[in-house]
């Protein structure tokens, strides 16, 4: 069972899943908002978990650029649906909010871990912007997808600041994010159907 609000057709649309840490600095927030804007410009959907930090930055970037976003929530669906910030874009059929849990459910770590499967399953590809090392929901969700789920290719942000977290995910089969800088390049990435890397 999925509870939700918005245009259910968006659940079949695919798109780019963007995930990451809750506690991040302004530089990563701005980076993630740019990714969201690019997804919107490409005419694709942005899929994320709706949590503070990277998730909301990605969704905000897409929606403010006139695009579509799909939030897979671990808790408080009713509150999110009634939030004034979400109301207009829900009515415009540009935002869908869903949850596998009761709309009144409060936050639970297990719920957050479980909903990660849906984020990946609804996407054509996924980008991990940031993560803690060997702990937290972003790490657990990415590792589960790489080692067991393998629904879609998992990309990781790679630059001079990413360090051992992204290197560790690449060893598990993640791909370096190629930083597409045009809508056409992003669409090509999402439709190329790259097979998820298999670890040995």
Task: Enumerate the language-model features and the residues they cover.
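Glycine-biased, small-residue-rich flexible motifs in mid-sequence functional cores and linkers
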Residues: 1-200
């Amino acid at each position: 069972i999925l509870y939700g609000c918005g245009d259910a057709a968006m659940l079949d649309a695919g798109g780019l899943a963007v995930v990451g840490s809750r506690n991040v600095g302004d530089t990563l927030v701005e980076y993630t908002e740019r990714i969201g804007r690019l997804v919107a410009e490409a005419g694709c959907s942005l899929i994320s978990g709706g949590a503070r930090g990277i998730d909301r930055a990605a969704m905000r970037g897409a929606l403010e650029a006139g695009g579509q976003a799909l939030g897979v929530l671990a808790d408080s669906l009713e509150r999110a649906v009634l939030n004034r910030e979400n109301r207009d874009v829900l009515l415009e059929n540009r935002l869908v909010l869903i949850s596998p849990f009761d709309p009144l459910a409060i936050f639970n770590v297990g719920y957050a871990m479980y909903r990660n499967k849906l984020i990946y399953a609804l996407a054509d590809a996924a980008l991990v912007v940031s993560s803690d090392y060997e702990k937290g929901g972003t790490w657990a969700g990415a590792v589960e997808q790489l080692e067991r789920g393998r629904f879609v290719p998992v990309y990781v942000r790679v630059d001079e600041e990413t360090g051992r977290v992204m290197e560790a995910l690449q060893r598990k089969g993640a791909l370096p994010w190629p930083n597409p800088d045009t809508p056409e390049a992003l669409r090509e990435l999402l439709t190329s159907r790259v097979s998820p890397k298999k670890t040995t």
